[in-house]
Structure formats: structure tokens, C-alpha cells
Amino acid sequence: MEPRPGTSSRADPGPERPPRQTPGTQPAAPHAWGMLNDMQWLASSDSEEETEVGISDDDLHRDSTSEAGSTDTEMFEAGLMDAATPPARPPAERQGSPTPADAQGSCGGGPVGEEEAEAGGGGDVCAVCTDEIAPPLRCQSFPCLHPFCIPCMKTWIPLRNTCPLCNTPVAYLIVGVTASGSFSTIPIVNDPRTRVEAEAAVRAGTAVDFIWTGNPRTAPRSLSLGGHTVRALSPTPPWPGTDDEDDDLADVDYVPPAPRRAPRRGGGGAGATRGTSQPAATRPAPPGAPRSSSSGGAPLRAGVGSGSGGGPAVAAVVPRVASLPPAAGGGRAQARRVGEDAAAAEGRTPPARQPRAAQEPPIVISDSPPPSPRRPAGPGPLSFVSSSSAQVSSGPGGGGLPQSSGRAARPRAAVAPRVRSPPRAAAAPVVSASADAAGPAPPAVPVDAHRAPRSRMTQAQTDTQAQSLGRAGATDARGSGGPGAEGGPGVPRGTNTPGAAPHAAEGAAARPRKRRGSDSGPAASSSASSSAAPRSPLAPQGVGAKRAAPRRAPDSDSGDRGHGPLAPASAGAAPPSASPSSQAAVAAASSSSASSSSASSSSASSSSASSSSASSSSASSSSASSSAGGAGGSVASASGAGERRETSLGPRAAAPRGPRKCARKTRHAEGGPEPGARDPAPGLTRYLPIAGVSSVVALAPYVNKTVTGDCLPVLDMETGHIGAYVVLVDQTGNVADLLRAAAPAWSRRTLLPEHARNCVRPPDYPTPPASEWNSLWMTPVGNMLFDQGTLVGALDFHGLRSRHPWSREQGAPAPAGDAPAGHGE
């Protein structure tokens, strides 16, 4: 009777024992077959040991290639016993199952099994499981050579890569040792302590499997090194937090998981479906619900999962799904209707769809996480705010008090669906409304009131709109209160306010156009500023000209935060050029508009270096008008001074360049035409060479490290690993010459300059700074002394002799003009 090959790791070794006494078989082959059965029985116990680590037994035996079965069986059949014979694998792993005779032959036969038993020293006890080690499962840890079971070490090493007996770091496991001296290895990967030995085992081609230490989520399926590829015989089991489930959990964070479970569980089966993997199963619920309403597949699934009839669940799901697309479009009545539908079905399903509808508008509008405090939101909310504010401001039309109340209500309509903090947006208009009603003296309060939130105006463009409207109201109060000290406060307010209402509407409508132009390019911003400039032929439009300067303040603040000192000063040439012209036109019209335009021109011209004369003249005119105007004139000059401080960085706002968020982080000071870079900080910089480091620079340009392959790796001589990189700066150094000789194509491909601008020049010292040199800590390698980036000298260990290459005689510094050939700027 022929023995049946082991087709599963749970095979009972009892029925296969009798063929050992069969006289027709070879003497040692039944013994090898019995060892295979023992190995499979131990493999099943190994899976139970791994269950203690945190892996369920069902997950390990979900398919035919289990954790222990695939490891031990494939290692046993891949060549540990006999590499020449074809391996015999279970039918689930191979298409054709070998015959029993082939299965016995694949086990290696009697002589090979005896050799392994003799070479392995049978009778050893594993220190982990305290059982006798079967010869096919025997392994020895390197370098301590302690014997263990392979399944035990595959469980132990990922948790702690040390020998269980002597606590020595294990580089690899030695398996399949024969009497002839051949063996195989299982390297331990991802341990920096034993990386060299493990990689050497893979390069030698003896590795038949590998063990990954550390986080099992990052374990690869295979690894290649030295032309050899090693596949993991036992892949990482599906842990509770795999990458696929992490993606599902990320989606759950984006939209809460409770609404997705609601269509699938009714009133009775809520607790039964909670323990399953809900995120992966319920993620397609929202897009799949409309298809289920037409085809009838998902309602059946919902009824089965809930334990109740499918009809009520469908009746509860379909109205909510029908109302979801309008809610995603931005409506709120649909969201409330979704909540009512969920409340109506509360007896069978919890009102879980309501949070999804409540979160739809912010997700659709903001379209990402909340914007950065230094990056304004998109132009969509701003255009919506400006259109509504233009209608509200032009609606009241006549009196000043209705207009101010309209301005106070403007941010509320825009802030409710868009901004998280409405009180900040509405604070400035409310104060300006009280300033309109109080008279000429209180306008000193709105100046500070709208100046305080100025530091937060770049957080959202709605705040910018509210503050601009607040400044417009304060400007109306100041424009009416300045000359009102002489001619009475009531009459100028009645004459100026009706004309100011249309201009407030025009200014509110022009702000989004200007911001969109500034975002699109400098040309659009200049056209917007030029379109705002011709609005000042009459007296009330001097106020509009004054509002043109504060309108650039939000961009100036954000531009200053993003660009720093790199923004060109010529970007602000257009606003100061428009300010003197408006100043001349307004000065010919009335004294009040002259004072306001002079304040605006002084604030705009002080922010540009090219219009300093206009700044001084406008500042003198503003001081003269404030002294002549009395209290109202002093308020106007104070507000002009406040806006001068706010718009002192304004010229950079007209030409934003690229993402402002990263400009400051990537900026660096370069030596060259900048006057500040020519004078570094004085003093000697001491560079001590690193002793005991043997490294070489490999002449292999890395194209993926730099654009043109100007990056060379620095290799450690002991391990061959890349420890650092060298980036070339020009084509004249010794490293560049060697690289050009080794790789001629590099000189044609590189974009490096012929000579670097910040090249090292010889020192210019009248006498050697012996006092500084004597204070150096001297090493046998020698010190290199630099002064402001210039090599001063390298010191010998036995004396203070300068050895820099530009010395004419030993120990004497080179003169100033003795620069090396080819290094002149």
C-alpha cells in the first residue's frame, strides 16, 4: 500500500505510519516520509504559536499557503534536502500533484535524510518550544550557531532579533546542512546591526527565504541584491491595520462611517454587523445606493445584513439618496430634508445620513483641509461676497445710516456658509457704523478697530472684504468730518453720503476683479489699478482714490510673508504713479479730499523706493492740511499714518510670484552681485578633518539626485554603502576633471558654470596670524584654517607651516593678487 502525500498541514500522521514496515519499499524512504508528516504536524502547532503573537488561526489557514505550511513545506521542497529533484507541493499550490513515489523521491530518500540527521546533530531541543528539533525544521543562528526550530525562529526574530540563548544579534539562519558541507540561509533583513552579513548571504545565492524585522506592514514580498532575488515563502499575514484598511480608515475620517452602515443594518442586526470590517464593505455605499434602487441588488443586501425585511430599508434609503446630490451642490434645505428623512426612519435605522449631509457644503466649498493662515482662499467665495455686498450697498441708496447697516449685514451673508469665525468679519463694519452715527470725534476708534484685525486679514478673503468695507465707512466719516470742523458736521455729511454709496458699491465690485488680476499676473493687477485711478475727477471720488491704497494692503501683507526681501521694488511703481495724479486732481477740488489723497499718496509712496520725493511732498501737504483742518484733519492724518505703517511693504503685492508658501523656505543667500554677500561675518572658521573615516567618492553621477547628474556618491570603504553625496558647483575642480575623464558625456550634459562665482581666493594677510594658529587643537591629520570662506592654510602636526597651494614659499602667505588661473570672477 503506497502512502498518500501530505496535501494539507493538518494531515493526521496515524494512517501513514504502517507503510514504514512494508518490505517492498526502501529502508529509509518511509522514515523520510514520517519526518515529513511530523514536520506538517509541527507546522500546525507553529501556526498556533503565531496565533499567540496576534494572528488568528483562521487568517493563517484562509488559503492553502499558510504561514507555517508554506514556509516549511516550500523550504523543505525547494532544495534543502535535494535540490536536484523536483519539489512536491500540495495540489493547491501546484497544478499537477506528483505521485506518491515522486513524493517519496522528492523528500530526498533515505541517504539524504540520514546525512541531514547526522550533520544536524539530531536530538537537540529547541530553546523556544522545548521540543525535539525535527531534522527538516532544524536551523542554526549565525554567528552563535545555536540550534532552533525554523517556525520558532520565524516567530521570535520579527519580535526580537537576538538569539534566545545568548542574546546575540542574528544575521541569518543556517538551514539544510548536509554532510557534504552545502547549506542554505535565511537572512534577517532590515536590521542595521547585521545588514552586512545578511546582504552577503543574499549576494552569495544561498538565501531561500528571508525574515523581515520591524513593522510587518512594510515587509516586502521579495528582495533583490547582487543579481539574486529572494521571495518570501511566508508573506506577511493580514494584520488588523494593513495598508488597504488604512486607506479605508482614511476615507472613514473624510466621511463618518456611521451613515454608511445605516443602510445595511436595520433595527435588529446593528450589533451583529459592528464587529465586521465595515469600512471596506461600506465605503461604496453612497455611490452604490442609486444603482441599488434601480436594480434591486443592494436593497436585498441591506435586508439580509439588517435581519429585517428589505422593503423598509429601501424606503428609508431612497429618499435620502435622492436628496444627496442637491445637498452636495451647496443647498441647506436639502440637508435638513435628509435629516427629516433619517428621523422618520429612526424606528428601523438610526439618523446616520444627517452628518454626511451636514458636512457636504464645507467639503465641496473648501475642497481641501482648512486653508493655511498665510494663503488666502480661492476667488470663488470672494466673488460671491462682492456681488452680494454690491447689491446691499447700492440698495439703500440714500441715507448714511441705512448704508452703514447694509455694510454691517454684508459679511453675515457671506460668512455663514464660508468662514468659521463670523464675529471677526463683522466686528469692523459694526464699529464703522457707530462711527458714522457718532460724529467727527469718534472716528479715532475705527482706525484702531480696523487696524487690529489687519494681522488676520490673510486668513480668509472674507475678513479682508469686511475690513475693506469698514475702512470705506471710516473714510466716509473722516472725509465728512475733516472740513466739517469749519463748515459744520451735519451739512457735509448730507452732501457726501449719497455720492459715496455708489462709489462704495463700485469699490466693492472692483475688489474681486483686482484680486483675481493680482493672482493671475502683474499685467492684470496693473490694469486693475489703472482702472481704479480714473475714478477721481470729482470731490467724492477722492475718497475712492483713498480706498485704492488700502485695497492693496491684504496682498501686501501676504506678499511680504511669502516673498520676503526677494520681491522686486519695481512692482509697486504703478500705485505711487497713480497717487500723485489723483492727489493733484483732488487738491484742485476740495481741501478735505486733498488731505485724504495726500495721506494715501504718502502711504503708497513711502512703500516704494523710487518715489521718495513724492512721499515727502505728500507728507508735508498732509501735515499742513491736518494743522489747518483742526480735529478732523488730525484724525485723517493719524489714519494716514496708520495706513502708511500697514502698507509700508505694499510694492511687493502687485506682482505675486509662484506659491508664496514655499518662497521663504527655499530662499538662500548667494555670493555675487548682492552687496551684503560680499562682506561675510569676520573671524576664522576652523575645519578639522574627520579622522578614522575611510571613504571614496565614486565617479558615478546620479541623474535622479540632481537634474543634470552633478551629484557624486561618497561610499564607505568598509561596507560599500553611500554615506554622503558630493554636489559639484563648477567644471574646473579636480573632482570635475576626474569625472570628465571618466564620463565624457557629463561635460556635454551638465549645466554647471565654467567657474563658480564664490570660488576660494588666496588670503590677504600682511603677517601670518600666529596667535590664532597657536590656539588651534592640532591633530596628526592636520588642520585646515578658513577665513570668511577662504582657505588660509593647513597646519603640519610638527610645526606651524602653511601648506595652502597659493603660497610662494613655505610658511609665507601669498599676496592678494596671486589668484589661481581660471578662478577669477
Swiss-Prot record:
Q: Where is this region: Disordered?
A: 1-121, 221-312, 325-683, 803-825
> What lineage is on file?
Viruses, Duplodnaviria, Heunggongvirae, Peploviricota, Herviviricetes
Biased composition (Basic and acidic residues) is annotated at 552-563
Q: Which Pfam families match?
A: zf-C3HC4
Q: How is it modified after translation?
A: Auto-ubiquitinated.
Biological process terms in GO annotation: protein monoubiquitination; protein polyubiquitination; symbiont-mediated disruption of host cell PML body; symbiont-mediated perturbation of host exit from mitosis; symbiont-mediated perturbation of host ubiquitin-like protein modification; symbiont-mediated suppression of host cytoplasmic pattern recognition receptor signaling pathway via inhibition of IRF3 activity
Q: Where is the composition biased (Acidic residues)?
A: 46-57, 242-251
Q: PROSITE patterns recorded for this chain? A: ZF_RING_1, ZF_RING_2
Catalytic class of the enzyme:
transferase
Tell me the protein's name: E3 ubiquitin-protein ligase ICP0
Q: Does the keyword Transcription regulation apply?
A: yes
Q: What is its EC number?
A: 2.3.2.27
Where composition is biased (Pro residues), the residues are: 368-379
Q: What job does the chain carry out?
A: Evades nuclear antiviral defenses triggered by dsDNA viruses. Acts during the initial stages of lytic infection and the reactivation of latent viral genome. Prevents the antiviral effect of nuclear bodies by degrading host PML and SP100. Prevents antiviral response to viral DNA induced by IFI16 by degrading it. Additionally, inhibits host IRF3 nuclear signaling to prevent interferon production by the infected cells.
Q: Which domain of life is it from?
A: Viruses
> What gene is it encoded by?
RL2
Quick one: signal sequence residues?
Answer: none
What's its catalytic activity?
A: S-ubiquitinyl-[E2 ubiquitin-conjugating enzyme]-L-cysteine + [acceptor protein]-L-lysine = [E2 ubiquitin-conjugating enzyme]-L-cysteine + N(6)-ubiquitinyl-[acceptor protein]-L-lysine
- Compositional bias, Low complexity, is annotated for 273-283, 290-303, 350-367, 380-394, 402-439, 492-510, 519-540, 567-641, 811-825
Residue stretches of biased makeup (Basic residues): 658-667
- Coiled-coil ranges per UniProt: none
What ranges of residues constitute the RING-type zinc fingers?
126-167
Renumbered to this chain, the Gly residues biased-composition regions fall at 479-491
UniProt lists compositionally biased (Polar residues) regions at 1-10, 456-468
